[in-house]
A protein has these predicted regions:
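N-terminal (or domain-start) structured segment
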Residues: 22-116, 154-156, 162, 178-203, ...
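Hinge/capping helix and adjacent helix->loop/strand transition within the periplasmic-binding protein
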Residues: 84-90, 104-191, 240, 245, ...
Length: 324
């Protein structure tokens, strides 16, 4: 009798919770939603976040979706703030590759990427490319590797910033090809591209959209794309993966929220975001950024993030990369 009483009580509790959770998801959001952007206003991630916020607000009947720009410490400032927010789905981080790379190079983060966050949805990806100064002799990955192997000094390359996705793409090439290259640090894509165009640095891993106008102008040349397939607007140029199997490097924006958010809320958030980013309105407003807009489920994003973290940990360890 006692056991049946316990079972009955548990069933009543479950029945009492389920409608409440469903109601919570149906009513979401019940207060302003805040999207934390780990960069200053005006950059590509900020622009994507503002377009997303505007269209999410419209989908939610005009309920406010606010942008909080919190740059600093290689995105750690904003990430730590979100990690400590109430786990109710009303606070989200507009995550970039740094969310996955930082754990590989910094072992004293004020948060645990895998434990302190719940995945919501991808927003968009951008392909990465290896480009070179127009006067640099090699024009393919194989020729770059051959040049590096015969050069008495390591080849220099650059990226938009140290310990970012472009930097680690170069480290991955070094490891896969067995060559020596030295990363030249810049603070941002624009100054790095300027010096590659000027011939001060021969090679650069950058977002294809950022480098493309220089390639189109004949100031740079595309060595290879780091995406799964050849670029639609440069289909004559091979991918990195055609030489080194599995060599794919993608810049991304995704949404994560503090761990512990109710599952029905996560599912509603993800479904609404997927609906927005797949809409013609969102794609029309973001097409000038050169992004591939798409969403996925919390489970899909979480699985992808785990794979990416493991990959960057392997690359960073082999390169002995550590945060300052």
């Amino acid at each position: 009798f006692a056991m049946r009483s316990v079972v009955f009580a548990l069933l009543m509790t479950a029945l009492a919770v389920s409608p409440s959770q469903a109601q919570t998801a149906a009513d979401f959001p019940t207060s302003p939603v805040r999207l934390f952007v780990p960069f200053a206003a005006g950059g590509p991630t900020d622009v994507v976040a503002r377009i997303l916020a505007e269209q999410l607000s419209a989908r939610w009947g005009g309920k406010p979706v606010l942008i909080e720009n919190r740059p600093g410490a290689g995105t750690i400032v904003a990430t730590a703030l979100v990690a400590k927010a109430p786990p109710n789905g009303h606070t989200m981080l507009v995550a970039t590759n740094s969310l996955l790379i930082n754990p590989a190079i910094n072992h004293s983060l004020p948060y645990d990427t895998l434990k302190d966050f719940a995945s919501v949805s991808m927003i968009a990806t951008q392909p990465v490319a290896l480009v070179a100064n127009k006067s640099f002799a090699p024009s393919t990955v194989q020729e770059v590797v051959a040049e590096a192997k015969k050069s008495p000094a390591p080849l220099n390359y650059t990226s938009p910033g140290p310990r970012g996705v472009g930097h680690l793409a170069g480290e991955m090439l070094k490891q896969r090809a067995g060559i020596e290259m030295v990363h030249i640090n810049y603070n941002g894509s624009a100054p790095a591209l300027t010096d590659v165009v000027a011939g001060r640095v021969p090679l650069m891993f950058d977002i294809w959209h950022s480098a493309k106008r220089y390639v189109d102008a004949g100031q740079l040349k595309l060595i290879a794309g780091a995406s799964a397939e050849r670029f639609a607007d440069a289909s004559n140029v091979a991918t990195m993966a055609e030489t080194y199997s599995g060599f794919q490097v993608t810049a991304f924006n995704a949404l994560v929220t503090p761990a512990g958010a109710p599952q029905p809320v996560l599912e509603k958030l993800s479904a609404d975001i997927r609906a927005v980013v797949s809409s013609d309105a969102f794609r029309e407003k973001t097409k000038h950024l050169g992004i591939n807009a798409y969403g996925n489920t919390p489970a899909e994003l979480s699985a992808w993030m785990r794979t990416e973290i493991a990959r960057w940990q392997e690359v960073a360890k082999a390169a002995n990369l550590q945060a300052n």
